[in-house]
Amino acid sequence: MFRLFFLLLPYIALAQYPKAMDFSKLYQGKLDSVAVVHRTGWTKETSWPEAPEEERITEKRKRLPLSKGKRLFKILQDKTVYKEEYPLLNDVVSSFLFYANGNEMLTMHFSTATKQLTMYRGDELIFAGMSKGKLTKKLIRYLYPKLSAKELYMNFFILWEEI
């Protein structure tokens, strides 16, 4: 038993723990623009034995229309869209960058596979956990705007079970 504890100690120490949402640190001002950095692929942790490469991540950047950015920002202020659990697996994350007066005010990282969600204001972590409900729906919709409702349901069935 004692050996098992010391064997698991490095994994416990390196694991990221959930952090409750700190609404006092969430940016409250006006937004100028919202950028989306959509990443797809796999990491060393999520690759499979016959994978052509150990790790492959592709990145596509686009600007989200301001109306959609404001709608997403309003959803972020809802206390019911956060789940204070952290997934065991780290996956490729896409980023949503919120700007005001040309400065980055809020950075949000989201994984479609695990619903992992981390939010930063500058370098300060303000939330680490998972998304749920309408936040998950909107994030997936903004990352995959060309998919129909049926395709979204088929591709993200596991994600939609709780919604």
Per-region residue spans from a language model:
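Function-determining sites in protein domains
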Residues: 16-163
